């Protein structure tokens, strides 16, 4: 698999879970002998929702809720078959979305 690259994108609402998952992926890949670039922090996506507190009137009284989506990017250069097998077996939390390209 010389000259190839695996790109892993991680998404999560909890920054601690995504950092722990990225650390686990980097440790696994370096143990198998491939080189790693990252984890590169990508811009955090922030969604703000505005809700009226009262069920009927008092539109001036509002509440804001936000959801932050943290993202990380990891590139694996020159992966070996052992690296791919180790990545398939790695156990990550369910709260972390993994996209492998």
From Swiss-Prot:
Gene Ontology molecular function terms on file: structural constituent of ribosome; tRNA binding
Keyword set includes Nucleus: no
Keyword check for Cell membrane: no
Gene3D superfamilies: Ribosomal protein S10 domain
Keywords: Ribonucleoprotein, Ribosomal protein
GO biological process annotation, one example: translation
Record's GO cellular component terms: ribonucleoprotein complex; ribosome
Pfam name, any one: Ribosomal_S10
Function: Involved in the binding of tRNA to the ribosomes.
Binding partners and assembly: Part of the 30S ribosomal subunit.
Family: Belongs to the universal ribosomal protein uS10 family.
This protein's name: Small ribosomal subunit protein uS10
Source organism (scientific name): Mycolicibacterium smegmatis (strain ATCC 700084 / mc(2)155) (Mycobacterium smegmatis)
Classification of source organism: Bacteria, Bacillati, Actinomycetota, Actinomycetes, Mycobacteriales
Gene: rpsJ
């Amino acid at each position: 698999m010389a000259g190839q690259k695996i790109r892993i994108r991680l998404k999560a609402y909890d920054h601690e879970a995504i950092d722990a998952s990225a650390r686990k992926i980097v440790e696994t890949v370096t143990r198998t002998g491939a080189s790693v670039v990252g984890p590169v922090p990508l811009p955090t996506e922030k969604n703000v929702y505005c809700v009226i507190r009262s069920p009927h009137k008092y539109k001036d009284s509002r509440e804001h809720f936000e959801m932050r989506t943290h993202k990380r990017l990891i590139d694996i250069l020159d992966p070996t078959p052992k690296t791919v097998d180790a990545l398939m077996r790695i156990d990550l939390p369910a709260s972390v979305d993994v996209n492998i390209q």
